A protein has these predicted regions:
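Alpha/beta-hydrolase-fold enzymes
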Residues: 54-142
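Short beta-strand immediately N-terminal to the catalytic nucleophile in serine-hydrolase-like folds
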Residues: 44-46, 71
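Conserved acidic catalytic loop of the alpha/beta-hydrolase fold
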Residues: 23-41
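Acidic catalytic loop of the alpha/beta-hydrolase fold
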Residues: 144-145, 183-193
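Glycine-rich "HGGG/HGxG" loop immediately N-terminal to the catalytic nucleophile
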Residues: 3-18
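Short beta-strand/loop motif that positions the catalytic acidic residue
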Residues: 179-181
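Active-site nucleophile elbow and catalytic-triad environment of alpha/beta-hydrolase enzymes
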Residues: 143, 147-169
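Gly/Ala-rich beta-loop-alpha elbow adjacent to hydrolase catalytic centers
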Residues: 46-50, 54
Length: 193
C-alpha cells in the first residue's frame, strides 16, 4: 500500500508531516529496489494516483527502468494545481492539516462524476462502467476515503511538479512508455490521454 492507504495506515489520506509527495515516491523506490532481480527488466506500472507517482519516480530515478506503463493518468496545468494547493495549504496553516477535508475532496473529484451523474447514482460512478464494482468501491472503507488537507496539499504539490514540462528532459530518450486510458475516463481526458 502507498503511505496513507490500507489497513495498516495510522491515518487514511495522510502521508507525512512534511514533504509527503516525496515520501510517497521514496516509499515507491524502496519497493522497487526490494523487487529488483538480476536479469529481469524493471517495468513500473501506475494507475490513477499511482500513475502520477510512477511518473515522478521515472523523473527522479530513470536509470535501470526499462519501461513505464501509465494507466488512467492525466495532465494538470499549473493554474488547476494552484487552485487546489492554495486552499489545502491554508487549511494546514489553520491547524486542520491532519483532518479529512470534504471541501478539497469535492474540489478535486466532483467534476469527474458530472458526465456520469444520474438519479440514484453515486459520486463514484466515474470509476467504472460496472455498477457492482462501483458499489464494492463505495462500501469498502479502504477505498474512496477522503484525504486529509495535508494529503491533498501533498497531492496537488506533486501534480504541480509534474506540470513543469522542463522536467521531462530527465527521462531517457529511449524509455518505452505505454499510456492507457479508458474511453470514458475523465482523468485521461475521456480516452485522449
Amino acid at each position: 500500500n502507498h503511505l496513507g492507504h490500507g489497513a495498516e495506515a495510522p491515518r487514511l489520506g495522510w502521508f507525512a508531516k512534511r514533504n509527503g509527495w516525496s515520501r510517497l515516491v521514496e516509499d515507491l523506490k524502496t519497493v522497487m529496489d526490494s523487487l529488483a532481480a538480476p536479469g529481469l527488466p524493471r517495468v513500473l506500472l501506475g494507475h490513477s494516483m499511482g500513475s502520477f507517482l510512477a511518473r515522478e519516480y521515472a523523473l527522479r530515478y530513470p536509470d535501470g527502468l526499462e519501461a513505464l506503463v501509465l494507466s488512467g493518468t492525466g495532465w494538470h496545468p499549473k493554474p488547476l494545481c494552484m487552485a487546489g494547493l492554495l486552499p489545502a495549504k491554508a487549511l494546514c496553516l489553520l491547524g486542520r492539516g491532519h483532518k479529512p477535508s470534504a471541501l478539497l475532496d469535492r474540489l478535486a473529484f466532483s467534476a469527474n462524476n458530472r458526465p456520469f451523474a444520474k438519479a440514484g447514482g453515486t459520486a463514484c460512478d466515474w470509476l467504472s462502467r460496472d455498477a457492482q464494482q462501483v458499489q464494492a468501491y463505495v462500501t469498502d472503507p479502504l477505498c474512496g476515503f477522503v484525504f486529509t488537507a495535508s494529503g491533498f496539499a501533498d497531492l496537488f504539490d506533486g501534480l504541480l511538479n509534474l506540470s513543469r514540462t522542463a522536467r521531462l528532459k530527465n527521462l531517457p530518450g529511449g524509455l518505452p512508455v505505454l499510456l492507457l486510458s479508458g474511453s470514458r475516463d475523465p482523468v485521461g481526458g475521456m480516452g485522449k490521454g
